[in-house]
Amino acid sequence: MKNDLIRPNVLSVKIISNVSPEMAKKLELEPHHKSLGLITADCDDVTYTALDEATKAAEVDVVYARSMYAGAGNASTKLAGEVIGILAGPSPAEVRSGLNATLDFIDSGVGFVSANEDDSICYYAQCVSRTGSYLSKTAGIREGEALAYLVAPPLEAMYALDAALKAADVEMCEFFAPPTETNFAGALLTGSQSACKAACDAFAEAVQSVASNPLGF
């Protein structure tokens, strides 16, 4: 139904206590990166936000994070889902702490929201009040600044991003042009926390307006 939360699901989680030198080289790890934490889930954008939370909760870095092609609905295997993320840290204990923070965030009630009655159109409008090292690097902003993380299907996203930029004192620092790997689109906007929240609200409202009247122009 409209405004329903589409809850994300974690599909697999594993720790590599002592990563092999060959793997470390391929992942371009730093010398202090001794252990890895791996996760897959059925929602990429929530997982990316959760991985950023991990960097604030533990001594870990996000060293790999990629979306799977065509999204979770077209996953080729049981545990592939929509995204794989890899955390790296100096010890298994730190990596475990980072993974626990990731899991806690995914289970906290954050997720895509349905824009219509049959849940066939959904969007992600998450205000990140304080970025960690991962999202701040992705957005090219200082760590700790606020972000509006906005994602929707292609047309809905383009229309709603324009509305968000006009509704609040925010700047676009990263644009996810359609189609992304999962056939969506979106952006990262930055500004004050209140401005980012206003941008999220405007984005959500605009996506819902498209969903309710897709052919009216």
UniProtKB/Swiss-Prot annotation:
Binding residues annotated for ethanolamine 1, in chain numbering: 44, 82, 112, 182-184
Gene Ontology terms: cellular component: bacterial microcompartment
- Determine if Cytoplasm is one of this entry's keywords: no
Amino acids binding ethanolamine 2: 45, 176, 180
Disulphide connectivity of cysteines: 127-200
Its keywords, alphabetically, are: Bacterial microcompartment, Cobalamin, Cobalt, Disulfide bond, Metal-binding
Q: What is its main location?
A: other
* Record: residues binding cob(II)alamin: 32
Question: What InterPro entries does this protein map onto?
Answer: BMC_CP, BMC_dom, CcmK-like_sf, EutL, EutL_PduB
Lineage: superkingdom: Bacteria
Post-translational modification, briefly? A disulfide bond is seen in native crystals; it disappears upon reduction with tris-(2-carboxyethyl) phosphine, which also reduces the protein's affinity for ethanolamine. It has been suggested to confer redox modulation to pore opening.
Give the UniProt subcellular location, in the record's own words. Bacterial microcompartment
Question: Could you say which residues are annotated as the site Important for gating?
Answer: 69, 74, 183
Q: Which family does it belong to?
A: Belongs to the EutL/PduB family.
Q: What does this protein do?
A: A component of the bacterial microcompartment (BMC) shell dedicated to ethanolamine degradation. May be involved in cofactor diffusion across the BMC. Cobalamin is covalently bound to 1 subunit of the trimer on the concave (lumenal) face in a closed pore conformation; whether this is physiologically relevant is unclear. The closed form has 3 very narrow channels (1.3 Angstrom at their narrowest) per trimer lined by acidic and aromatic residues; 2 ethanolamine molecules can bind in each channel, on either side of the constriction.
Q: What is this protein called?
A: Bacterial microcompartment shell protein EutL
Gene behind this chain?
eutL
